[in-house]
Protein backbone atom coordinates (compact mmCIF):
# COMPACT_ATOMS: atom_id res chain seq x y z
CA UNK A 1 0.00 0.00 0.00
CA UNK A 2 2.84 2.45 0.78
CA UNK A 3 4.38 1.87 -2.64
CA UNK A 4 1.12 2.30 -4.52
CA UNK A 5 0.34 5.52 -2.66
CA UNK A 6 3.88 6.82 -3.23
CA UNK A 7 3.66 6.10 -6.97
CA UNK A 8 0.32 7.89 -7.30
CA UNK A 9 1.57 10.95 -5.43
CA UNK A 10 4.81 11.03 -7.42
CA UNK A 11 3.03 10.68 -10.74
CA UNK A 12 0.52 13.47 -10.18
CA UNK A 13 2.50 15.65 -7.74
CA UNK A 14 0.82 19.10 -7.70
CA UNK A 15 -1.65 18.35 -10.50
CA UNK A 16 -5.25 18.57 -9.28
CA UNK A 17 -6.43 15.17 -10.54
CA UNK A 18 -9.94 14.45 -9.26
CA UNK A 19 -10.53 11.03 -10.81
CA UNK A 20 -11.01 7.65 -9.17
CA UNK A 21 -7.69 5.84 -9.23
CA UNK A 22 -5.66 2.77 -8.37
CA UNK A 23 -2.07 1.65 -8.90
CA UNK A 24 -0.72 -1.72 -10.01
CA UNK A 25 2.97 -2.38 -9.28
CA UNK A 26 4.84 -3.49 -12.41
CA UNK A 27 8.39 -4.46 -13.41
CA UNK A 28 9.33 -1.11 -14.90
CA UNK A 29 7.37 1.03 -17.32
CA UNK A 30 7.57 -1.70 -19.95
CA UNK A 31 5.69 -4.04 -17.62
CA UNK A 32 3.00 -1.41 -17.19
CA UNK A 33 2.61 -0.85 -20.94
CA UNK A 34 2.63 -4.53 -21.89
CA UNK A 35 0.13 -5.46 -19.18
CA UNK A 36 -2.18 -2.64 -20.26
CA UNK A 37 -2.07 -3.73 -23.91
CA UNK A 38 -2.89 -7.31 -22.91
CA UNK A 39 -5.68 -6.15 -20.59
CA UNK A 40 -7.59 -3.90 -22.95
CA UNK A 41 -7.05 -5.61 -26.32
CA UNK A 42 -7.63 -9.14 -27.61
CA UNK A 43 -5.95 -11.06 -30.42
CA UNK A 44 -7.04 -9.56 -33.73
CA UNK A 45 -7.68 -6.12 -32.24
CA UNK A 46 -5.74 -3.01 -33.24
CA UNK A 47 -3.51 -0.84 -31.05
CA UNK A 48 -2.97 2.78 -32.12
CA UNK A 49 0.56 4.16 -31.73
CA UNK A 50 2.58 7.08 -33.19
CA UNK A 51 4.63 6.55 -36.34
CA UNK A 52 7.72 7.70 -34.42
CA UNK A 53 7.85 5.48 -31.36
CA UNK A 54 9.71 3.11 -29.09
CA UNK A 55 9.89 -0.12 -31.09
CA UNK A 56 8.66 -2.31 -28.25
CA UNK A 57 5.11 -0.96 -28.50
CA UNK A 58 4.69 -2.81 -31.79
CA UNK A 59 6.58 -5.83 -30.45
CA UNK A 60 4.30 -6.07 -27.40
CA UNK A 61 1.29 -5.97 -29.70
CA UNK A 62 2.77 -8.52 -32.10
CA UNK A 63 3.48 -11.20 -29.49
CA UNK A 64 -0.18 -10.98 -28.48
CA UNK A 65 -1.40 -11.19 -32.10
CA UNK A 66 -2.60 -7.58 -31.91
CA UNK A 67 -2.38 -5.40 -35.00
CA UNK A 68 -0.92 -1.89 -35.00
CA UNK A 69 -2.20 1.25 -36.71
CA UNK A 70 0.11 4.28 -36.69
CA UNK A 71 -0.82 7.94 -36.66
CA UNK A 72 1.54 10.62 -37.97
CA UNK A 73 2.85 12.31 -34.86
CA UNK A 74 3.81 15.67 -36.35
CA UNK A 75 2.27 18.23 -38.64
CA UNK A 76 5.13 20.66 -39.24
CA UNK A 77 6.21 21.69 -35.72
CA UNK A 78 3.18 20.59 -33.70
CA UNK A 79 1.23 17.49 -32.68
CA UNK A 80 -0.80 16.08 -35.56
CA UNK A 81 -4.25 15.79 -34.02
CA UNK A 82 -5.82 15.49 -37.48
CA UNK A 83 -3.89 12.27 -38.11
CA UNK A 84 -4.86 10.96 -34.67
CA UNK A 85 -8.52 11.57 -35.49
CA UNK A 86 -8.27 9.92 -38.90
CA UNK A 87 -6.48 6.88 -37.48
CA UNK A 88 -8.98 6.43 -34.65
CA UNK A 89 -11.91 6.77 -37.05
CA UNK A 90 -10.35 4.10 -39.27
CA UNK A 91 -10.01 1.69 -36.34
CA UNK A 92 -13.55 2.49 -35.15
CA UNK A 93 -14.88 0.88 -38.32
CA UNK A 94 -13.58 -2.55 -37.32
CA UNK A 95 -13.87 -2.70 -33.51
CA UNK A 96 -16.07 -1.28 -30.76
CA UNK A 97 -13.24 -0.16 -28.49
CA UNK A 98 -10.19 2.06 -28.92
CA UNK A 99 -6.82 1.70 -27.22
CA UNK A 100 -4.04 4.14 -28.07
CA UNK A 101 -0.64 5.14 -26.73
CA UNK A 102 0.55 8.70 -26.16
CA UNK A 103 4.19 8.84 -25.02
CA UNK A 104 4.24 12.25 -23.31
CA UNK A 105 5.84 14.36 -21.88
CA UNK A 106 9.33 13.99 -23.36
CA UNK A 107 8.39 11.66 -26.19
CA UNK A 108 10.93 8.98 -27.05
CA UNK A 109 12.87 9.58 -29.27
CA UNK A 110 11.99 13.19 -30.24
CA UNK A 111 11.69 14.80 -26.79
CA UNK A 112 8.46 16.55 -27.84
CA UNK A 113 5.84 17.40 -25.19
CA UNK A 114 2.24 18.19 -26.05
CA UNK A 115 0.96 21.58 -24.91
CA UNK A 116 -1.91 21.68 -22.45
CA UNK A 117 -4.13 22.99 -25.25
CA UNK A 118 -3.22 20.00 -27.43
CA UNK A 119 -4.15 17.72 -24.56
CA UNK A 120 -7.49 19.50 -24.15
CA UNK A 121 -8.26 19.01 -27.83
CA UNK A 122 -7.27 15.34 -27.66
CA UNK A 123 -9.43 14.67 -24.60
CA UNK A 124 -12.38 16.46 -26.21
CA UNK A 125 -12.09 14.24 -29.29
CA UNK A 126 -11.77 11.04 -27.22
CA UNK A 127 -14.96 12.04 -25.41
CA UNK A 128 -16.72 12.27 -28.77
CA UNK A 129 -15.40 8.84 -29.72
CA UNK A 130 -16.59 7.43 -26.39
CA UNK A 131 -20.22 8.11 -27.31
CA UNK A 132 -20.10 4.98 -29.48
CA UNK A 133 -16.83 3.22 -28.53
CA UNK A 134 -15.11 2.61 -25.20
CA UNK A 135 -11.73 4.35 -25.07
CA UNK A 136 -8.53 3.55 -23.19
CA UNK A 137 -5.63 5.98 -23.44
CA UNK A 138 -2.23 4.66 -22.35
CA UNK A 139 -0.11 7.64 -21.31
CA UNK A 140 3.51 6.47 -21.21
CA UNK A 141 5.34 8.96 -18.96
CA UNK A 142 8.67 7.11 -18.81
CA UNK A 143 10.72 10.28 -19.31
CA UNK A 144 8.50 12.82 -17.52
CA UNK A 145 11.14 13.52 -14.88
CA UNK A 146 13.57 14.67 -17.57
CA UNK A 147 11.29 17.50 -18.65
CA UNK A 148 12.87 20.92 -19.17
CA UNK A 149 9.78 22.36 -17.45
CA UNK A 150 9.85 19.93 -14.53
CA UNK A 151 7.81 22.12 -12.17
CA UNK A 152 4.89 22.16 -14.62
CA UNK A 153 5.43 18.74 -16.20
CA UNK A 154 2.26 17.32 -14.60
CA UNK A 155 -0.07 20.25 -15.31
CA UNK A 156 -1.51 18.57 -18.41
CA UNK A 157 -2.94 15.79 -16.22
CA UNK A 158 -5.63 18.20 -15.04
CA UNK A 159 -7.20 17.84 -18.50
CA UNK A 160 -7.90 14.21 -17.56
CA UNK A 161 -10.62 15.45 -15.20
CA UNK A 162 -12.78 16.13 -18.26
CA UNK A 163 -12.89 12.55 -19.56
CA UNK A 164 -16.30 10.98 -20.03
CA UNK A 165 -17.51 7.91 -18.15
CA UNK A 166 -16.58 5.75 -21.15
CA UNK A 167 -12.93 6.88 -21.26
CA UNK A 168 -10.19 5.39 -19.08
CA UNK A 169 -6.59 6.57 -18.81
CA UNK A 170 -3.73 4.37 -17.64
CA UNK A 171 -0.57 6.31 -16.82
CA UNK A 172 2.49 4.09 -17.32
CA UNK A 173 5.23 5.03 -14.82
CA UNK A 174 8.85 3.92 -14.77
CA UNK A 175 11.04 4.08 -11.65
CA UNK A 176 13.76 2.71 -13.90
CA UNK A 177 13.86 6.07 -15.69
CA UNK A 178 12.88 8.39 -12.82
CA UNK A 179 15.54 6.99 -10.48
CA UNK A 180 17.90 5.61 -13.17
CA UNK A 181 17.52 2.21 -11.50
CA UNK A 182 17.07 0.05 -14.59
CA UNK A 183 18.11 -3.28 -13.09
CA UNK A 184 15.62 -3.10 -10.22
CA UNK A 185 12.62 -3.32 -12.61
CA UNK A 186 10.18 -1.10 -10.78
CA UNK A 187 7.20 0.85 -12.10
CA UNK A 188 3.45 1.14 -12.01
CA UNK A 189 0.23 1.40 -13.98
CA UNK A 190 -1.96 4.22 -12.62
CA UNK A 191 -5.59 3.58 -13.57
CA UNK A 192 -7.79 6.68 -13.84
CA UNK A 193 -11.53 6.93 -14.56
CA UNK A 194 -14.59 8.88 -13.50
CA UNK A 195 -16.21 5.92 -11.73
CA UNK A 196 -14.75 3.81 -8.93
CA UNK A 197 -16.38 0.67 -10.32
CA UNK A 198 -14.63 1.09 -13.67
CA UNK A 199 -11.27 1.46 -11.94
CA UNK A 200 -11.96 -1.55 -9.73
CA UNK A 201 -12.91 -3.74 -12.69
CA UNK A 202 -9.65 -2.90 -14.48
CA UNK A 203 -7.68 -3.28 -11.25
CA UNK A 204 -8.99 -6.81 -10.63
CA UNK A 205 -8.13 -7.92 -14.15
CA UNK A 206 -4.67 -6.36 -14.05
CA UNK A 207 -3.91 -7.82 -10.62
CA UNK A 208 -4.69 -11.30 -11.95
CA UNK A 209 -2.64 -10.64 -15.08
CA UNK A 210 0.31 -9.53 -12.94
CA UNK A 211 -0.03 -12.51 -10.62
CA UNK A 212 -0.05 -14.91 -13.55
CA UNK A 213 2.86 -13.24 -15.34
CA UNK A 214 5.48 -12.01 -12.84
CA UNK A 215 3.78 -12.65 -9.47
CA UNK A 216 5.32 -9.63 -7.76
CA UNK A 217 8.05 -7.07 -8.32
CA UNK A 218 11.12 -6.81 -6.05
CA UNK A 219 10.30 -5.61 -2.53
CA UNK A 220 13.69 -3.92 -2.32
CA UNK A 221 12.86 -1.80 -5.36
CA UNK A 222 9.49 -0.75 -3.93
CA UNK A 223 10.95 0.01 -0.50
CA UNK A 224 13.75 2.01 -2.08
CA UNK A 225 11.28 4.15 -4.05
CA UNK A 226 9.09 4.80 -1.00
CA UNK A 227 12.11 5.79 1.09
CA UNK A 228 13.48 8.16 -1.56
CA UNK A 229 10.21 10.01 -2.16
CA UNK A 230 9.18 10.22 1.50
CA UNK A 231 12.41 10.46 3.49
CA UNK A 232 15.36 10.58 1.12
Predicted regions and their residues:
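Hydrophobic/aromatic residues located in beta-strands of well-ordered beta-sheets
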Residues: 47, 135-137, 169
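Conserved core segment of the aminotransferase class I/II
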Residues: 161-232
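Conserved core of the PLP fold type I
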Residues: 1-133, 144-163
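Walker B catalytic acidic pair
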Residues: 140-141
